[in-house]
Structures are given as C-alpha cells and as structure tokens.
Amino acid sequence: TNGNREKITREETAALRNKTVGIVGLSVGSTTAVALAMERGCGALKLADFDVVELSNMNRIRCALHELELPKWVVTARAIAEFDPFLELEIFEDGVTTENMDVFVSGCDVLVDACDSLGVKAALRLEAKRQACPVVMDTNDRGMLDIERYDRPEWTLGGFLHGRIDEPTMKSFAQAKIWTREALQAFVNVAEASERGQRSLPKVGTELVSWPQTYTGVCAGGAHAAEACRRLALGEALPDARI
C-alpha cells in the first residue's frame, strides 16, 4: 500500500509478485502465511498440512469455534482469501511426504519449517539443500529464529543448521518416527533455550505431544519468519545463522 512505500519499494513489490514461499505446518505456520499475504511478501504460497484444527490448537491458532475439525489449510486459506482473494495458493492437503517433497520444494524461493515431525524437518532440509533453497524456522522460544542458507552452500559449513548436523545424521533423522534427546539437542540445543523452555523442551515426545507454543510466541515468531522470508526472497544477504 502507499503507506508502506519505501519500507517496501515499488520495485520490491514488483519483484515479490514472482516469488513463492512454501510453508510446512500450519499452526505457527498459519501466522507466517497470513503475515506474508497481508504485506504481499510473495506472489504465491505453497501450504502443507494434513491435520485438522482441534480444541487444543486454539491456544496458538487464531480461528473460530465453528472451524473446529476443519483442515488447518482450509482455515488458513480462508483467512487469507477474506482479505486477498487474488493471492495464489497451492495446497498440499496431505502434508509433505517422501513422495511429494521434491514437488513441494520445487519452485520455492524460501521454505518455512513450522512442523512438529522430526522426519519431515530432516527430509525438508535434505531436499532444500539438494534444490538450493533457504529455510526459515521459528522455535517459539525467546524469539529464536534460524535462517539456513542452503542457496549459499559456502555459508552453511558443509552441513545443516549452521553446521550443527552432518548429512549422515540428518538422513537418519529423516527416517525417525519420534523425537529423541539427540535430535532435540541437535535441532534446538536445550542449553540455549529460555529457563522455562529448558524445562519443557526435553519432555517433547514423552510428556508433551509437540513443541510448547504460546500465542505471544507464535505471533512474534510468525512475524519475524515472514520478514525473513520477504528479505530472502528479495536477495538480501541475510547470514546463515541462529538469531
């Protein structure tokens, strides 16, 4: 809009029309999707999630009671269509799998990892590296944001997640069905989490069914991820780093 001119220039707006962002997971991912759509941080979104909205999701997904049991992608796509019916959406209603991962990543300028599954997180990065596509991940703890520059292999230290995980280990994670302490440490490093995060994160996969997420964290993380996506899509030299 005119009010955003110079924050986002005419030239950038024109360039962003030709950019595609792929988002895997539509809990915190839905906030990123809506933020990108609202400021037109891309011209197209690929959305992937097989799950439905449950009552337990309503602490972090902005939706109405009448949307319970609807697929998460429906809730997200509907929210976007209500303010921008012209944004191009491509839906992967069965989520991403080993069978469609290459198709999902193909054509994306940036990927957002917002899923809970260890196997999918790992497989997404293997494919992102193969197709040279950057990945953004918000951990929803003390504002932690990962920007992974697989489009700039000279920056990634030859591995994944800023050199934290080597390729054989990532391939083994891609076959995993549940989170292990080793995987959690590799992806997050619990010692770097907030005090309360250090208490809750180690319980993922045992006492907690998924990542602990508060709506304040989801809002902040979704916005930060959306801005990172826009800046990456515009070719800014954002570092391969955990912020």
Predicted regions and their residues:
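Phosphate-binding loop/pocket of nucleotide- and phosphate-handling active sites
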Residues: T1-G3, R231-I243
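N-terminal charged helix/coil linker that caps or initiates catalytic domains
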Residues: T1-V21
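Glycine-rich adenosine-cofactor-binding loop
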Residues: R17-E54
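Buried hydrophobic packing segments
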Residues: T32, L36, T76, G222-R230
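Glycine-rich phosphate-binding loop and adjoining beta1-alpha1-beta2 segment
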Residues: L47-D84
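A structured beta-alpha segment of the ubiquitous adenosine-cofactor-binding alpha/beta core
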Residues: W73-D109, C115-K121
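E1/E1-like adenylate-forming module used to activate ubiquitin-like modifiers
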Residues: D109-T216
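Oxidoreductase and adenylate-handling cofactor-binding alpha/beta cores
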Residues: E154, A220-A237
